[in-house]
Amino acid sequence: MREKRKYFIAERVLLIKRSKIRELFERASKMEDVISLGIGEPDFDTPKNIKEAAKRALDEGWTHYTPNAGIPELREAVVEYYKKFYGIDIEVENVIITAGAYEGTYLAFESLLERGDEVIIPDPAFVSYAEDAKVAEAKPVRIPLREENNFLPDPNELLEKISKNTRMIVINYPNNPTGATLDKELAKTIADIAEDYNIYILSDEPYEHFIYEDAKHYPMIKFAPENTILANSFSKTFAMTGWRLGFVVAPSQVIKEMTKLHAYVIGNVASFVQIAGIEALRSEESWKAVEEMKKEYNERRKIVVKRLKNMPGIKVKEPKGAFYVFPNISGTGMSSEKFSEWLLEKARVVVIPGTAFGRMGEGYVRISYATSKEKLIEAMNRIEKALEGEK
């Protein structure tokens, strides 16, 4: 279509930066024999019982609107889930069903932040947080996550970042992109800080079931229920990224206000998808599949870490969560972006530059092991060969 006129675009949209991850994927899509270690989604298919539940729901007529906050039975299933897995008591009024954790975090930013508010966001961090803050006309304030501190926030630095304008702290553990996990003591410390300063915690927890070795997950609603907005998703846990199903757990007053915005943004999540969500949470078959996925991820994690440790110019801190490794590549003498571009051209392997997640990501790349062992081994062979050739 030939366009003759210049179109007006809202300034808040123009402020949003295009993801560097997508740019790299587009380049890779034009090349042959590329192995992608960049994708942030499970390579597994959704468990069969969940798919069958969606099919039955369609046949049973679940093709109409639902209550904006979600089908009551699914909200009840979320309540049961937190009691069963964590011993945490919440009410149905504390839950809204969303189009993935993406919408959940968006609703949190839009419902709770105003122009001039400050939101403390880790650096590096998942790409959407800073952009969501801009759309909400809030100011992102970055707090560094350092390798020497296991990619965890320093409580003293957190206190230094808090001002009279601070409205929210964002945390995400198990972490994307670093694979770090949050220990109980630090989780409680962050909760105490939020309560002392009357600040919201937006805790994004979609990788909660993919933790390894001695790591444990502690939902932030356990420590600061009155201050925490917990965003979660079926996408990673049950390999349901394309279904767009998630939820938020928060104080009932916050959920009530979020639901008003949610009603005008999407109305409700597709009804048959919500029925599948009930099956996912309540079926033992679903949880057996999750355990199988976790076992496979752990085996892949070990393969990648072991191989990277023996490569020239690479240092790696062993991650205990999610499905990412965040190796330090500064020993290669290349920047994160240069290394990622070089690796794509030289080895036909996609990794994500750490700077896609913030300034503190310089000197690192994100590697996803959410792909088959065969592809991972071949990718490691290619990376090692390319690095050996640079020595």
Swiss-Prot record:
Protein name: Aspartate aminotransferase
GO biological process: amino acid metabolic process; biosynthetic process
Family: Belongs to the class-I pyridoxal-phosphate-dependent aminotransferase family.
A GO term for molecular function: L-aspartate:2-oxoglutarate aminotransferase activity
Quaternary data: Homodimer.
Cofactors: pyridoxal 5'-phosphate
Residues reported in the UniProt entry to bind L-aspartate: G40, N176, R366
Species the sequence originates in: Pyrococcus horikoshii (strain ATCC 700860 / DSM 12428 / JCM 9974 / NBRC 100139 / OT-3)
Principal subcellular localisation of the protein: cytoplasm
Gene symbol of the encoding locus: aspC
PTM sites of type N6-(pyridoxal phosphate)lysine: K236
GO cellular component annotations of the record: cytoplasm
Enzyme's top EC category: transferase
EC nos: 2.6.1.1
Subcellular compartments: Cytoplasm
Pfam families the record matches: Aminotran_1_2 (PF00155)
Statement: the UniProt record of this protein carries the keyword Cytoplasm: yes
Catalytic activity line of the entry: L-aspartate + 2-oxoglutarate = oxaloacetate + L-glutamate
Keywords recorded for this protein, A-Z: Aminotransferase, Cytoplasm, Pyridoxal phosphate, Transferase
UniProt-listed NCBIfam families: PRK08361.1
